[in-house]
Swiss-Prot record:
Residues 439-476 are annotated as: Disordered. It comes from the Eukaryota. GO terms for biological process: chromatin remodeling; DNA-templated transcription; regulation of DNA-templated transcription. Required for replication-independent chromatin assembly and for the periodic repression of histone gene transcription during the cell cycle. The gene is hir1. Pfam families: Beta-prop_CAF1B_HIR1, Hira, HIRA_B, WD40. Belongs to the WD repeat HIR1 family. It is found in: Nucleus. This is Protein hir1. WD repeats lie at residues 15-54, 69-108, 130-169, 172-211, 233-276, 279-339, 343-384. It comes from Aspergillus terreus (strain NIH 2624 / FGSC A1156). Gene3D superfamilies: YVTN repeat-like/Quinoprotein amine dehydrogenase. Keywords: Chromatin regulator, Nucleus, Repeat, Repressor, Transcription, Transcription regulation, WD repeat. InterPro entries: CAF1B_HIR1_beta-prop (IPR055410), HIR1-like (IPR031120), HIRA-like_C (IPR011494), HIRA_B_motif (IPR019015), WD40/YVTN_repeat-like_dom_sf (IPR015943), WD40_repeat_dom_sf (IPR036322), WD40_rpt (IPR001680). GO terms for molecular function: nucleosome binding.
Length: 999
């Protein structure tokens, strides 16, 4: 092993002269070196190009420098070969990270100036804190000190998604070589694993709203890790089995935690460094323990991985998986901490940079680490994970770039053909799938002059047909179907023969225009929706509704015929007897003499087991005349509301894991007494005890004489809803904020979000209160309109209404309701009516429906906390409702019948533009919903999609109308239209908008 440290390999700094009376800031010369010393800039990062020919470094001088690795390895060579290949200065601050893309085409750098620079290798060249590239170069992920993880497209460099899941600085990122996950390390003492699917080259932020999902959070190895480390650069092993996480601790000792894939735990720690380890780097190659001359095809030796670690103790350690101790420990390699490590692609050289400006290389001889195995062994070890590494390992050159341009041209033709088929272009569809020329994998047709027969003959070797030739010999199923349909004869009653007409759009690829695949994809996605890490401006449900939603009954205006007196008595007796059998407390006792008032039950003796449900709630008499009745929750012995330190609801300590118990901050508990009476009288029961705990310590306690059905609360207040329809509200210190609020029926849903409380009663009335201002934004509203009450009011018998699957409130006090029929509603306090935001019609008729389920919010970064709060208003509500529509539509099997309806409509005359019209209408509905809810980021996205679509469709009138509404004109009426758009888009602030309306 050789450590190479060339004198010229540095980011040269200024000359510091020991004489304080003079200083020199010009070029360094040997003469000046004798009277002073040169202070090199700190080097923060390094990386090696995929072909191993270039080393890139970044330092505090604001320069990105590219060096020749050949010159570094051969420092004794006296030839005048170039050493520094390039020097780029496009940043105004210290550059903290540089990374080559795995295909070698791009170089990314990030600095303190909050700018990410992407440098590209041109085929015809003219005279942030940390990044990571995916292994197929499809995405670039940047992390920084703002605690956000930003995903960029590796093709267009557009921002695809911002993940705000960390609570502190993010200082490390690594990608899974199987291209399924990436991991980030943060100063919040966690490593978070994200699952992703490589986006297509033309993907947009809207397409990827449901990609990049948080898989798990790892915190155990880092609970007491120091926060002084400058980096937490982790690394993924080349076989995909392990993650090496820097800055871990094992007791009081600094270590490197080895995390196992899948289970995301680990009991292996690399211990040996005296200071925190700031960077880990696995060698990109697998190594064999046997030399090549002793390897056989059946026995190539044990495959091992090699990892290098360095950090604040200025030492470098090299570990092999078969040894419990490091094979090499090099100390005092630099005067300050080692900041980054980078391996050459062949695994024979390791480069390191340090904060004192040191850049060095460590060259290994054959057998020092083992014997590098072929890259095919890496791919073989990754096949068990189902790798999807499109384009991985292909180093870009000028010739390769020219070939890529030709490939893209062929791919573009294939895309145009498929888009023509999807949009109902019969000519394009027939050209792409019906004629004899099959498309290649990139969408390009075979070259002219070649036939399928000739191609099949070319694939034969020694008289044996290859699988490719066998695949080419298989008949096209769409072509066969088309041939069967072409000459299908039918006979009329009089014996005449007719040929059935063939709809061109009904065969081949035209079937894919129906959105069936989009709906089914959402079922296969196993993603936990609405996780605490998701950004969605809705109250978090803590006391889940029954499976299938909260049941509702609708009663018509017509009444049943009056029953005879005897029948009525018999009916009452049966009802009372049945209620007694079910455990209900009888109001009337069925005796031999008839129905008599029930006598008080004697108190039970001995120790009694506390049941989960004590009894059904006693319903209010007003429900007997209400046309809408919602299911009332049973009386439970204990009702608990737990929140974490951020104020978000979480699982109570008794039902959570040990890891979750540590996150519980406050617990609000209501204990209902048993039905037994203390004095023998039914009215003399124990009071309900309400207690607020922090850990095991009670903070305050109160008592109520009424049975509690529901509780809710956050860091702003606590509330309890009682069986008699009263609602009590307390401050965080336990002071009663208002007198009891009395409703007309029992509360069935109680939610809160900030200072807002949502309460829904058993007769379907929605109440919204602001406890900060002790006010309500609107009068009580009924749920009857959203439960199809208008359809059922003429019936003589009760009918089941759609169940309520979600009823929540956002940070502005807007009520959001989702139903089991897939529809989603929001109440407009300015128009005093419900608005339908989502329905199943869009799911099967629109081309813009979501493809998969995942977290439902996405916020862009803003400069201030106030702007963050404004940007978060109503964030993710529209995707949340649309996801509920997809789930409920598929759950109840409505998608099949709706798609059959769409298919029949597409075959009829006059419905040629059906899909286009429905898609545009869906975008208009989204746009209006985002404007009504005040969802800033969704409005930006939907407005861009809508403008592109109506422009592509050539809808001149709609384009002019949209521009007039956005830009405005000389008339005040147009200005009134413009101001709401400008406020929502953030063009003007609230105060400026008010001044604009007054002028």
């Amino acid at each position: 092993m050789h450590i190479i440290k060339p004198v010229w390999l540095t980011h040269g700094g200024k000359l510091v002269v020991h004489d304080s009376s003079s200083s020199w800031h010009g070029p360094l010369t040997p003469t000046l070196l004798s009277t002073g010393e040169r202070k090199d800039f700190e080097v923060y990062s390094c990386d090696v190009s995929p072909d191993g020919s270039r080393l890139v470094t970044a330092a505090g001088d604001g320069y990105v420098r590219i060096w020749s690795t050949e010159a570094i390895r051969n420092t004794d060579d006296s030839s005048q070969k170039p050493k520094q290949l390039a020097s780029m200065s496009n940043h105004s601050g210290t550059i903290h990270t540089v990374r080559f893309s795995p295909n070698g085409k791009y170089l990314a750098s990030g600095a303190d100036d909050k700018i990410v620079c992407i440098y590209t290798l041109d085929a015809n060249p003219p005279s942030h804190s940390t990044f990571g590239w995916s292994y197929d170069s499809s995405i670039l992920v940047s992390v920084g000190l703002d605690s956000k993880v930003v995903v960029w497209s590796g093709h267009t460099f557009e921002k695809l998604k911002t993940l705000s899941v960390h609570q502190s600085h993010v200082k490390g990122i690594t990608f899974d070589p199987a291209n399924k996950y990436f991991a980030t390390a943060s100063d919040d003492r966690t490593v978070k694993i994200f699952r992703f699917t490589s986006p297509a080259p033309n993907s947009t932020a809207h397409d990827q709203m449901n990609n990049f999902v948080l898989e798990t959070t790892i915190s155990a190895p880092f609970q007491n890790s120091p926060l002084t480390a400058y980096f937490r650069r982790c690394s993924w092993s080349p076989d995909g089995m392990h993650i090496a996480a820097a800055n871990a601790v094992n007791g009081p000792v600094s270590s490197v935690a080895i995390i196992n894939r899948g289970s995301w735990d680990g009991d292996i720690n690399l211990i040996g460094h005296e200071a925190p380890v700031e960077v880990c780097a696995f060698s990109p190659r697998l190594y064999s323990t046997q030399p090549p001359n002793k390897q056989t095809p059946d026995n190539q030796g044990q495959a091992v991985t090699v990892i290098a670690c360095a950090g604040g103790d200025k030492s470098l350690s090299i570990w092999i998986t078969t040894n419990p101790r490091p094979i090499v420990v090099a100390q005092e390699l630099a005067a300050k901490s080692i900041s980054d490590l980078a391996w050459s692609p062949d695994g024979t050289c390791l480069y390191a940079t340090a904060l004192d400006g040191t850049i060095l290389a460590v060259r290994f001889e054959d057998g020092d680490l083992g014997y590098p195995m072929a890259m095919e062994e890496n791919e073989k070890s990754l096949t068990k994970f189902g790798t999807n590494r499109r384009g991985a390992g292909i180093t870009e050159t000028t010739d390769g770039l020219l070939l890529e341009e030709k490939s893209k041209a062929g791919e573009l033709k294939g895309v145009e053909g498929r888009m023509g088929a999807l949009m109902g272009d019969g000519h394009a569809s027939a050209e792409a799938t019906v004629n004899g020329k099959a498309l290649s994998s990139n969408g390009a047709a075979p070259a002219q002059g070649t036939s399928p027969t000739a191609d099949a003959q070319k694939t034969q070797t020694n008289g044996t047909t290859t699988p490719a030739a066998q695949e080419a010999d298989k008949p096209d199923p769409y072509q066969a179907k088309l041939e069967r349909l072409k000459q299908r004869p039918t006979y009329t009653k009089d014996g005449k023969k007719r040929i059935a007409p063939l709809l061109v759009s009904g065969a081949g690829a035209a079937e894919s225009s129906l959105p069936q695949a989009r709906l089914m994809a959402s079922v296969s996605s196993q993603v936990k929706a609405d996780t605490p890490q998701s950004i969605v401006d809705l109250s978090k449900p803590f006391d889940g509704l029954p499976k299938g939603g909260l049941a509702a009954l609708l009663f018509g205006n017509k009444r049943k015929l009056a029953q005879l007196e005897g029948d009525e008595d018999g009916h009452v007796e049966k009802r009372v007897a049945l209620a007694s059998q079910n455990g209900a407390t009888p109001i009337m006792a069925n005796t031999p003499d008839g129905l008599l008032p029930a006598q008080p039950q004697p108190p039970a003796t001995g120790q009694q087991q506390t049941p989960e449900y004590i009894r059904p709630a006693v319903t209010n008499p007003c429900m007997a005349i209400s046309q809408l009745r919602l299911a009332v929750p049973k009386v439970r012995s204990q009702i608990v509301r737990a929140i974490d330190s951020t104020g978000k609801p979480t699982e109570p300590p008794g039902a959570s894991s040990e890891a979750n118990k540590s996150r519980v901050d406050l617990v609000f508990e209501a204990r209902n007494p048993s039905p037994a009476s203390l004095t023998g009288r039914a009215v003399d029961r124990e009071p309900v005890r309400l207690t607020l705990f922090r850990g095991e310590q009670p903070l305050w306690q109160d008592f109520l004489p009424r049975t509690v059905l529901l509780v809710t609360g956050n860091q702003s207040m606590w509330a309890a809803a009682c069986e008699d329809g009263s609602v009590y509200i307390w401050t965080p210190a336990g002071r009663r904020l208002v007198s009891a609020l009395v409703l007309e029926a029992q509360p069935v849903i109680l939610e809160c979000n900030g200072p807002w409380i949502l309460c829904i009663s058993a007769v379907g009335m929605c109440y919204v209160w602001n406890v900060k201002h002790l006010s309500s934004p609107h009068p009580p509203i009924s749920l009857q309109p959203v439960l199809d009450a208008a359809v059922h009011t003429l019936g003589a018998h009760p009918s089941s209404a759609p169940a309520i699957t979600n009823a929540r409130i956002n940070s502005e006090g807007r009520v959001i309701v989702a139903l089991s029929n897939g529809e989603g509603y929001a109440y407009s306090p300015s128009m005093y009516t419900w608005q339908r935001m989502s329905e199943a019609w869009w799911a099967v008729g629109s081309q813009y429906w979501n493809t998969t389920e995942a977290p439902v919010g996405n916020l862009q970064s803003t400069d201030s906390q106030d702007k963050d709060a404004k940007a978060a208003v109503s964030a993710g509500i529209i995707p949340f409702l649309e996801r509920n529509t997809t789930n409920e539509t598929l759950l109840r099997g409505r998608a099949y019948f709706l798609q059959r309806l769409i298919k029949v409509l597409l075959s009829r005359e006059g419905y040629e533009s059906f899909e286009s019209s429905v898609s545009i209408a869906h975008l208009e509905n989204r746009l209006a919903a985002a404007l009504s809810l005040g969802a800033k980021e969704e409005f930006r996205l939907y407005l861009s999609m809508y403008a592109k679509r109506i422009g592509a469709e050539g809808l001149k009138n709609k384009v002019e109308e949209l521009l007039k509404g956005l830009i405005g004109g000389k008339h005040r009426d147009l200005q009134r239209v413009t101001v709401p758009y400008a406020k929502l888009l953030g063009v003007v602030d609230e105060s400026e908008a008010g001044d604009a309306m007054e002028t």
